[in-house]
Amino acid sequence: MAQQVSGRQPRYKRILLKLSGEALMGSEDFGIDPKVLDRMALEIGQLVGIGVQVGLVIGGGNLFRGAALSAAGMDRVTGDHMGMLATVMNGLAMRDALERSNIPALVMSAISMVGVTDHYDRRKAIRHLNTGDVVIFSAGTGNPFFTTDSAACLRAIEIDADVVLKATKVDGVYTADPFKDPHAEKFDHLTYDEVLDRKLGVMDLTAICLCRDHKMPLRVFNMNKPGALLNIVVGGAEGTLIEEGQA
């Protein structure tokens, strides 16, 4: 059930939350951890409870990694299509977790899957968001060679979201991988051009350029920190904010 969070007013009306498929694994090496799904559903429910409209894009890396198969000779387009199907599986699992918490949710797929998901339709997605449904966008952009990060930024622009929130395993963007370099320093704020110039690897080039060209703010944060998502939505300074530079 969507939880009411008293006394906290949202800064954003509509967000696009990007989750990695790996985030759904929890402590496992593969697949989906039901406890992680339930926790994420609870946090998303808190946002719905304060009137925030939530669009969601989930990667597929917990179920399928095309890089190794591509290196072994698999056709890239075939691998990308398999990856798209993995994102649909994750979307269905998340919808189930949300609905078990009495949070209405809809899965839309960029690839037609009659009887399994709704086909992606921008106007229909916005109507559902306006009624308080969580809309899960799956199958990426529907095209090979585009990442789910690019899909998240594209959908955010299409539905006129206020911000893209990218959930990761670390609490923002660093000068280097903080798991490998103990001297890595965290950025609190960056411009799109700084991300590109420094080759920080927050998202792929296409995704960052989409956000830059359409002035879509992007915040990178640690989804494993309890309450971080809600704190961002009510105006907290979690993680790293990436936005247009000041003229």
UniProtKB/Swiss-Prot annotation:
Inhibited by UTP. One of its GO terms (molecular function) is UMP kinase activity. It catalyses: UMP + ATP = UDP + ADP. Keywords: ATP-binding, Cytoplasm, Kinase, Nucleotide-binding, Pyrimidine biosynthesis, Transferase. Pathway: Pyrimidine metabolism; CTP biosynthesis via de novo pathway; UDP from UMP (UMPK route): step 1/1. Gene3D superfamilies: Acetylglutamate kinase-like. It is found in: Cytoplasm. Pfam families: AA_kinase. GO terms for cellular component: cytosol. GO terms for biological process: 'de novo' CTP biosynthetic process; UDP biosynthetic process. ATP binds at K18, L19, S20, G21, G61, R65, T168, Y174, D177. It is an enzyme of class 2 (transferase). Its EC number is 2.7.4.22. Coiled coil: none annotated. UMP binds at G60, D80, T141, G142, N143, P144, F145, F146, T147, T148. Catalyzes the reversible phosphorylation of UMP to UDP. Homohexamer. Belongs to the UMP kinase family. This is Uridylate kinase. It comes from Pseudomonas entomophila (strain L48). The lineage of its organism: Bacteria, Pseudomonadati, Pseudomonadota, Gammaproteobacteria, Pseudomonadales.
